[in-house]
Curated annotation (Swiss-Prot):
The keyword Transcription does not apply. It is found in: Cell junction, Focal adhesion; Cytoplasm. The gene is dixdc1a. Residues 1-21, 46-68, 309-349 are annotated as: Disordered. Belongs to the DIXDC1 family. Functions as a positive effector of the Wnt signaling pathway regulating antero-posterior neural patterning. One of its GO terms (biological process) is forebrain development. It comes from Danio rerio. Residues 357-439 form the DIX domain. This is Dixin-A.
């Protein structure tokens, strides 16, 4: 009988139905105490019998409660159910302790159940099997929870890896943005520095421009002064020419020759004055100033004007001599023709008035102007020396002189001449030269 009762207790699981929990709770309220395993089934039967009548009140109690409202009934029932639930939980915990340890929690301090003395080996086996089943179920539950936790851990690890990957991508993006920001800041600083440099250069250019404007105004005033001097010189030349024409018309040939010589001398002085003015004006400009071309053109115009005046005077003089010569002086005709003509008088280097009978054209270039200059030297080609060329060019300072010539071995070359008495080589009946400033470099 005791074995069957123990088997019934061991087969019951820790989880009970609500009806059994209610029965167990009522049995505790009735004051029954479970003392040993043999009396446990009898107490359960008594609880079942008593529970068949206790939960439901009699007719008298129903009549008494008819006077209360349904709300109070619900509140009372709810409180009663809560109490029953608490008692049921306590009973379940006691039953679990009884199945596992063989005694109730309140009996642990007073007495301990020993199945080695009172129970048989079959009961111990049943108890061990029940404990083993419970342990296996708990192990299975733990394994399921472990698998669930592992799956959650794997999911969390995957989420973590994805988040780390996204974080690395975001960090790369942030690093790239920082690099772009650094480059943009460096570019901005560089542009700011360039702007400052450009502003400084602009202010410097503005300052230079204002200075150049001042210098240009001064040079314009100087040019006007030189132009005034040139106009005065040309006017004096014209007046001298008119006076010379008046002297030639009075019939005195001796005074005509004297006036012609005086005219040539004065004309040379006036031209020298003009050339000095142009030289001082040229020195006031820079090396590559475009005003040099204007001054060169002006100088060539004045020289050609004086040359035309001299040519016309040379042509008119024989006619006037023939018209004014008296018959009594025809005997001296041979003597007069043997006199040297004024057109063959050697001129100073300050005058470009040259003889057309025995002269050599000289075309020379300078490093200050792209336009070549043309002068005449009153000597035949082959007799012109470097001294004659310097006198014709009439430029102050240290220069180097190169002349175009034909070399038997190399063909057309530029030949530099150093000595003043050296003969200048020619090219196709004229002299082509280049005049360059000597800056002291070694030759």
């Amino acid at each position: 009988m005791g074995a069957k009762q123990m088997k019934c207790l061991s087969s019951s699981s820790p989880s009970h139905t609500p009806k059994e929990e209610y029965i167990i709770a009522k049995s505790e309220d009735s004051g029954e105490l479970v003392g040993n395993h043999t009396e446990q089934p009898q107490s359960l039967e008594d609880v079942v019998k008593s529970s068949a009548t206790d939960p439901y009140p009699g007719p008298e109690h129903v009549v008494k409660e008819e006077s209360s409202t349904w709300e109070e009934q619900l509140c009372a029932q709810q409180e009663q159910l809560e109490k029953e639930m608490q008692e049921t939980r306590k009973m379940v915990s006691r039953l679990q302790a009884l199945l596992l340890h063989g005694s109730l929690p309140e009996d642990e301090q007073t007495s301990t159940l020993s199945f080695g003395d009172t129970a048989s080996s079959e009961q111990q086996l049943i108890l061990t099997r029940s404990r083993l089943d419970q342990s296996m179920e708990e192990s299975l539950d733990l394994k399921r929870e472990l698998l669930r936790y592992k799956q959650e851990a794997r999911n969390l690890q995957a989420v973590k890896d994805a988040l780390q990957q996204r974080m690395s991508v975001q960090e790369d993006s942030v690093l790239q943005l920082k690099q772009e920001l650094l480059r943009s800041s460096m570019t901005r600083e560089e542009l700011e520095g360039q702007n400052v440099e450009l502003e400084r250069k602009l202010s410097e250019r503005n300052r230079l421009l204002s200075e150049y404007k001042k210098e240009l105004g001064q040079k314009d005033r100087l040019l006007q002064q030189q132009q005034t001097k040139l106009d005065d010189a040309l006017r004096r030349i014209s007046e001298s020419y008119h006076r010379l024409s008046g002297c030639e018309n009075n019939g005195y040939s001796h005074m005509m020759d004297t006036s012609s010589a005086v005219f040539q001398h004065r004309m040379g002085d006036e031209l020298q004055l003009v050339r000095d003015a142009l030289r001082s004006l040229r020195d006031s400009f820079s090396g590559h100033d475009p005003q040099h071309h204007t001054l060169d053109t002006l100088e060539q115009g004045v020289a050609s004007l004086v040359d035309r005046l001299h040519t016309s005077d040379t042509k008119k003089r024989p006619e006037r001599k023939g018209s004014t010569r008296s018959p009594g002086r025809k005997a001296n005709h041979t003597d007069r023709e043997s006199w040297p003509s004024t057109s063959k008088i050697a001129h100073s280097h300050s005058s470009p008035v040259l003889s057309a009978a025995a002269s050599t054209k000289v075309l020379y270039y300078t490093d200050r102007s792209l336009t070549p200059f043309l002068v005449n030297i009153p000597k035949r080609l082959g007799d012109v020396t470097l001294q004659d060329f310097k006198a014709a060019v009439d430029r102050h300072g240290s220069f180097r002189y190169h002349f175009k010539s034909l070399d038997p071995e190399f063909g057309t070359v530029k030949e530099e001449v150093f000595q003043d008495d050296a003969v200048i080589p020619g090219w196709e009946g004229k002299i082509v030269a280049w005049v360059e400033e000597d800056h002291g470099e070694g030759r």
